[in-house]
């Protein structure tokens, strides 16, 4: 069966998500998501147990959400199963065998790899380009904004690497307009069609003007680099 998938991150554009198909969330996404089919968590087991309130656990159980954990977190499995949460161990060995790479810079990379693991393709097409025959043929990104002067600059390349693997398999990755993922600093192709240095060094989408669709986003904080230091900076438009 060919189907769509949403990978829901925790960035500002998460408010655009319409949950129109199977939805996978990451780490603290359980706190705001309207539905989740899977929740991938790679934080330490102490954080995973202490930070999830009974109310959130009840919500995940109501969704029928499966919690996907690394095998090294097996010690917390009884805790979640005891409150009715289904547990799935991340198939790391199968992923490493199929893709022959260890380039995973954050949880989103693991999520993309997991989706592509279950996707089959054919090259027997008129164009010779790959076509999906089963699994996910369209992956929608929401909340995977990865603004390039924040701590995400250390992770962004990994996500884009897996986006490239997806494209090479004929899988379409559909991102939000306000995301910096898969884009140059100014949204232009280098060296073509009037490309110049105008705006060089300017953040792709400045914090103070970020809006997602027609919705304002709450004021939150993100790590950003200032000189040699990392500082927390606010973003959002202040909706209550």
Predicted regions and their residues:
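Metal-ion/cofactor- or nucleotide/acyl-coenzyme-handling active-site neighborhoods
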Residues: 1-240
